[in-house]
UniProtKB/Swiss-Prot annotation:
The keyword Membrane applies. Malate dehydrogenase; catalyzes a reversible NAD-dependent dehydrogenase reaction involved in central metabolism and redox homeostasis. It is a peripheral membrane protein. Belongs to the LDH/MDH superfamily. MDH type 2 family. This is Malate dehydrogenase, cytoplasmic. Gene3D superfamilies: Lactate dehydrogenase/glycoside hydrolase, family 4, C-terminal, NAD(P)-binding Rossmann-like Domain. One of its GO terms (cellular component) is plasma membrane. Keywords: Cell membrane, Membrane, NAD, Oxidoreductase, Tricarboxylic acid cycle. It holds the Pfam family Ldh_1_N. NAD(+) binds at Q16, I17, D43, G90, Q113, N132. Expressed constitutively in roots.
């Protein structure tokens, strides 16, 4: 029996990440090789022509799973009936801009998109915010779409999670698919805490702790952390654009694991609404280790936290609290 198509919204769809993301969705990377999709692409009026070009290319690619394409600058049309919303559109920080200016622009974007999703998306729509500041944009969206369950509003920290996996696999010269259970705690910013204390590597003699195999705490507590924290900036420096294909790929990973479930014994990082777990203040969107099954995520409980980790986790929570205050001051 063929599945009913799922409607997937991508905002900012004419941009760099959007251009990398829509073919992945149309190929079944996000929702599975047997799941037909209808793509809803939204962008701002100045990008309308470019957006139409992307639509033409999607038609030209003749993707078997792609059952329709909506390309629009109208937020209501874009949000109508969507089952998954990937929010890539936002206002990027330009040179010389204050953080508050960027924040107020994004607050107004996410406030209006929240209202449109709330009124027009399918019931139980799953939302993933990618645009920076991702955690706080997601928080604003959640606040202004009260009828969307809070568990359905998430932000992307899977990119940071995958970056951490990549660094470990390079350091140990192992397959990245054999490394698991790194954690990104906190904000999708340079204050995030990439934690390897619970991470393992599959070896010929079973699973071994990453810390034991690397056996260089100075690197793990120093350069490893800063490399992951600063990776986005390093890519901008090298490519002159921010990371697009890796962001698109990790957005697919995030939604796929959320919808289809995580493998047994594996956890991933997602920015989710805090319930006070691990002493993180509730009322923040904070990255936690989670497992997913039946379309629901659950925070992994009971992991021991050492003093070094505690400080880092608190520092990134503090930054998120400050961002939240700044965002709310933009609403007044």
């Amino acid at each position: 029996m063929a599945k009913e198509p799922m409607r997937v919204l991508v905002t900012g769809a004419a941009g760099q990440i959007g251009y990398a993301l829509v073919p992945m969705i149309a190929r079944g990377v996000m929702l599975g090789a047997d799941q037909p999709v209808i793509l809803h692409m939204l962008d701002i009026p100045p990008a309308a022509e470019a957006l139409n070009g992307v639509k033409m290319e999607l038609v030209d690619a003749a993707f078997p799973l792609l059952k329709g394409v909506v390309a629009t600058t109208d937020v209501v049309e874009a949000c109508t009936g969507v089952n998954v919303a990937v929010m890539v559109g936002g206002f990027p920080r330009k040179e010389g801009m204050e953080r508050k200016d960027v924040m107020s622009k994004n607050v107004s974007i996410y406030k209006s998109q929240a209202s449109a999703l709330e009124a027009h998306a399918a019931p139980n729509c799953k939302v993933l915010v990618v645009a920076n500041p991702a955690n706080t944009n997601a928080l604003i969206l959640k606040e202004f779409a009260p009828s969307i369950p809070e568990k359905n509003v998430t932000c992307l920290t899977r990119l940071d999670h995958n970056r951490a996996l990549g660094q470990i696999s390079e350091r140990l010269n192992v397959q990245v698919s054999d490394v698991k259970n790194v954690i990104i705690w906190g904000n999708h910013s340079s204050s995030q805490y990439p934690d390897v204390n619970h991470a393992t590597v599959k070896t010929s003699t079973g699973e071994k702790p990453v810390r034991e195999l690397v056996s260089d705490d100075e690197w793990l507590n120093g350069e490893f952390i800063t490399t992951v924290q600063q990776r986005g900036a390093a890519i901008i420096k090298a490519r002159k654009f921010s990371s697009a294909l890796s962001a698109a790929s990790s957005a697919c990973d995030h939604i796929r694991d959320w919808v289809l479930g995580t493998p047994e014994g594996t956890f991933v990082s997602m920015g989710v609404y805090s319930d006070g777990s691990y002493g993180v203040p509730s009322g923040l969107i904070y990255s936690f280790p989670v497992t997913c099954s039946g379309g629901e995520w659950k925070i992994v409980q009971g992991l021991p936290i050492d003093e070094f980790s505690r400080k880092k986790m608190d520092a990134t929570a503090q930054e998120l609290t400050e961002e939240k205050t700044l965002a709310y001051s933009c609403l007044e």
